[in-house]
């Protein structure tokens, strides 16, 4: 039996961290959405109890370091399942880019195995299990515009974003999320994004309010080490994006445009400066 699951990339329209838990986990306050740049995850039953991971990327491990592998282990343990699976991942999302590719692949594994093994778990349970793999997995289980709080485990769906176009641009660097998070100093955070105003803008479908209140508290940390991030951000705004910022821990920067024609111009202009550029739209996975 074979199951195929789509694993969309995510971006952070708003990203704030409020404090650190005693175990080192961050307390998050984020607004996230998924876009139509996606990996595809194929699951095949095995006659043995093995977990096999096959990818078309030379940058990904195929053992227990892979988040998709970990997702299988968590689900097997929770449901007391003794079955094997081969996971084939067709990558489109750049690796170590701040776009949640590994987490989305892991979430796709949870959704797909839930179907393949007839486990009948709801998305809330899958999201709770996903937190054992990575803090972005609970959101990626849903993969729809949402307000994400707690350790990443409290996912509150939001209305669809108003129609907009998004230009993603990844500089030629890869970022280690743990390294960036270790550098967070709460006493030195000068400016927190106004997440409440961003949420209000989405509720009201108000472009100006959304664009004015986007923000990522981690951007200064990553950009200090990788100045290319601010260069790309400036280029996005110069070429006509309505707003621009870094996604996640970076290094991918995205610009947003209300109109497709302007987004296409920004995309075409940026292609001359950055090799990995994508023109995408917001997507809610449950609509496909």
From Swiss-Prot:
Upper taxonomic lineage: Bacteria, Bacillati, Bacillota, Bacilli, Lactobacillales
According to its UniProt record, which residues of this chain constitute the active site? 10, 136
Organism for this UniProt entry:
Lactiplantibacillus plantarum (strain ATCC BAA-793 / NCIMB 8826 / WCFS1)
Which Pfam families would you find in this protein's record? GHMP_kinases_C, GHMP_kinases_N
Cite the annotated pathway.
Isoprenoid biosynthesis; isopentenyl diphosphate biosynthesis via DXP pathway; isopentenyl diphosphate from 1-deoxy-D-xylulose 5-phosphate: step 3/6
* Keyword vocabulary terms for this entry: ATP-binding, Isoprene biosynthesis, Kinase, Nucleotide-binding, Transferase
Task: Output this protein's name.
Answer: 4-diphosphocytidyl-2-C-methyl-D-erythritol kinase
User: What Enzyme Commission number does this protein have?
Assistant: 2.7.1.148
Please name the PANTHER family in this protein's record. Answer: 4-DIPHOSPHOCYTIDYL-2-C-METHYL-D-ERYTHRITOL KINASE, CHLOROPLASTIC
The record's Gene Ontology biological-process terms are: isopentenyl diphosphate biosynthetic process, methylerythritol 4-phosphate pathway; terpenoid biosynthetic process
Keyword Kinase included in the entry's annotation: yes
